[in-house]
Amino acid sequence: LVFVVAISDIATVNGKICEKPSKTWFGNCKDTDKCDKRCIDWEGAKHGACHQREAKHMCFCYFDCDPQKNPGPPPGAPGTPGTPPAPPGKGEGDAPHPPPTPSPPGGDGGSGPAPPAGGGSPPPAGGDGGGGAPPPAGGDGGGGAPPPAGGDGGGAPPPGA
């Protein structure tokens, strides 16, 4: 009976396993045991290991490719909605904060805010993250005072006229 169980475990290992870069590991991965524990505890993986890819040591998590056998991260894992993140530990690869989440345009995440709907350039980066008021619709994104009311203004006609 033990022999049959061992064979079924080997068949599981040789089954289809999907490799994905860890979503919770930051920095170089040099501690495979720590990577393995984080993949299992935080990401619901079957296994984790450090590998060098593209000249970087990264933590990779291994999941069962069958979605029915891979329920996802365990409850209470960092990044699970409605649960507080675990406090960061010490050492390389520890996240200084929880995994990044999508932020609205004008926030401080990502490569910068999206351009305004009316055109023009996005607000300068590195500000307070507030964003401010959008430019007037149809504007060119430039500043300056509006033309005086009435009169021809002596300039080119407005767009669409």
From Swiss-Prot:
Disulfide bonds join 18-65, 29-50, 35-59, 39-61. Anther-specific cell wall protein which could contribute to the cell wall architecture of epidermal anther cells via intermolecular disulfide bridges. This is Anther-specific protein SF18. Epidermal anther cells. Belongs to the DEFL family. Residues 16-65 are annotated as: Defensin-like domain. The lineage of its organism: Eukaryota, Viridiplantae, Streptophyta, Embryophyta, Tracheophyta. It is found in: Secreted, Cell wall. Residues 1-8 form the signal peptide. Keywords: Cell wall, Cell wall biogenesis/degradation, Disulfide bond, Secreted, Signal. Residues 70-88, 96-105, 113-125 have a biased composition (Pro residues). It comes from Helianthus annuus. Residues 126-155 have a biased composition (Gly residues). Pfam families: Gamma-thionin.
